[in-house]
């Protein structure tokens, strides 16, 4: 599983101001965005009632229109603190203990709330994409002049 958002153009590191603004917008709008309490209740916490108990991860993106979007990952697990420092934590199960949301800092929109389903928690490894493959010649080319065609030439061929 690779980690991207829709219409992603790139990534950026959110500043302290970006994080503070994302938190402010989430606090302001979480009750409305979470009005249906999907995968919450019973043994699962209702996320907007326990906001202070979650550890957070912030990942910044830019979309194709140039908007700055912060993806905020909420984790309520005292054993996940070390994982949170190393990489993006993605899980299955755990209901309201694990959820994430997106904040568009350019428009102030809070959207994309996803609360994990019920069941045992399973940490998902993040599959990293291989870098692009660069073709290289099998045999190193001897130093020489380059013809206008781009083909290396031997020094003996320098005179026509």
Model-derived regions: residue spans:
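Functional cores of ribonucleases/endoribonucleases
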Residues: 35-98
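C-terminal partner/receptor-binding element of secreted or periplasmic proteins
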Residues: 95-131
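N-terminal export/targeting and maturation segments
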Residues: 1-30
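Structured segments of extracytoplasmic/periplasmic soluble domains
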Residues: 25-36, 104
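Cationic, low-complexity basic patches in intrinsically disordered or flexible, solvent-exposed regions
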Residues: 139-142
């Amino acid at each position: 599983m690779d980690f991207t958002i829709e219409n992603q153009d790139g990534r950026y590191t959110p500043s302290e101001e970006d994080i503070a603004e994302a938190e402010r917008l989430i606090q302001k709008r979480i009750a409305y965005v979470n009005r249906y309490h999907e995968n919450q209740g019973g043994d699962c916490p209702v996320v907007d009632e326990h906001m202070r108990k979650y550890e957070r991860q912030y990942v910044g993106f830019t979309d194709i229109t140039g908007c700055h979007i912060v993806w905020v990952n909420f984790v309520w697990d005292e054993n996940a603190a070390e994982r949170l420092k190393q990489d993006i934590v993605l899980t299955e199960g755990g209901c309201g203990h694990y959820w994430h949301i997106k904040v568009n800092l350019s428009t102030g929109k809070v959207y994309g709330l996803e609360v994990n389903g019920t069941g045992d928690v399973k940490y998902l490894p993040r599959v990293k994409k291989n870098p692009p493959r660069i073709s290289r010649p099998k045999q190193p080319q001897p130093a020489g002049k380059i013809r206008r065609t781009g083909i290396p030439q031997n020094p003996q061929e320098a005179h026509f």
